[in-house]
């Protein structure tokens, strides 16, 4: 497995620990809330939650912000734009867009694990316009065409 070093900056509102892998085979690192005061996410509402960190990803890398399964299943708290994308040239604070799909208001306390971040390599492409595409068995079938 290749290890890539990424620069991370603690901002003024940072508290707690840097994102880290929970187990040897974890794909994601937990992101920690860095809000000064508790933030209430009302049922059905969306809130932007600060993490107190900024990162400098190498070229051809992105950070994906994804929900934590425990928050989703127990409280209906998930990432509204999942996965959120942090581009390699972004240098601002990483913030997480959380939505409360539950029936009860939910309070985000400082230091709470609110999402997970996955660092992923990607490739850029060039479009090649074509008047036709290679046929496949699936063709244009989508939205459940291969079964439920």
Curated annotation (Swiss-Prot):
Cofactors named for this entry: Mg(2+)
Pathway entry: Pyrimidine metabolism; dUMP biosynthesis; dUMP from dCTP (dUTP route): step 2/2
This protein's UniProt keywords: Hydrolase, Magnesium, Metal-binding, Nucleotide metabolism
Keyword DNA repair: no
GO MF annotations, alphabetized: dUTP diphosphatase activity; magnesium ion binding
Domain of life: Bacteria
One Pfam match: dUTPase
Catalytically driven reaction(s): dUTP + H2O = dUMP + diphosphate + H(+)
Record keyword Hydrolase present: yes
Swiss-Prot/TrEMBL GO biological process terms: dUMP biosynthetic process; dUTP catabolic process
Chain residues that bind substrate: 68-70, 81, 85-87, 95
SUPFAM superfamilies (UniProt xref): dUTPase-like (SSF51283)
InterPro entries: dUTPase, dUTPase-like, dUTPase-like_sf, dUTPase_trimeric
Family: Belongs to the dUTPase family.
Function summary: This enzyme is involved in nucleotide metabolism: it produces dUMP, the immediate precursor of thymidine nucleotides and it decreases the intracellular concentration of dUTP so that uracil cannot be incorporated into DNA.
HAMAP family linked to this entry: dUTPase_bact (MF_00116)
Protein name: Deoxyuridine 5'-triphosphate nucleotidohydrolase
Organism of origin: Rickettsia massiliae (strain Mtu5)
């Amino acid at each position: 497995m290749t290890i890539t070093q990424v620069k991370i900056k603690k901002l003024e509102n940072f508290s707690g620990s840097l994102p880290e892998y929970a187990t040897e085979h974890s794909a994601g690192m937990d992101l920690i809330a860095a809000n000064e005061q508790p933030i209430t996410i009302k049922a059905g509402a969306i809130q932007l939650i600060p993490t107190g960190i900024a990162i400098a990803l190498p070229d051809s890398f992105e950070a994906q912000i994804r929900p934590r399964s425990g928050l989703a299943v127990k409280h209906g708290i998930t990432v509204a734009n999942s996965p959120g994308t942090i581009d390699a040239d972004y240098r601002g604070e990483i913030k997480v867009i959380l939505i409360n799909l539950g029936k009860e208001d939910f309070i985000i306390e400082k230091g709470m694990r609110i999402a997970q971040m996955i660092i992923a390599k990607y490739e850029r492409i060039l479009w090649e316009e074509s008047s036709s595409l290679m046929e496949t068995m699936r063709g244009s079938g989508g939205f459940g065409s291969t079964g439920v």
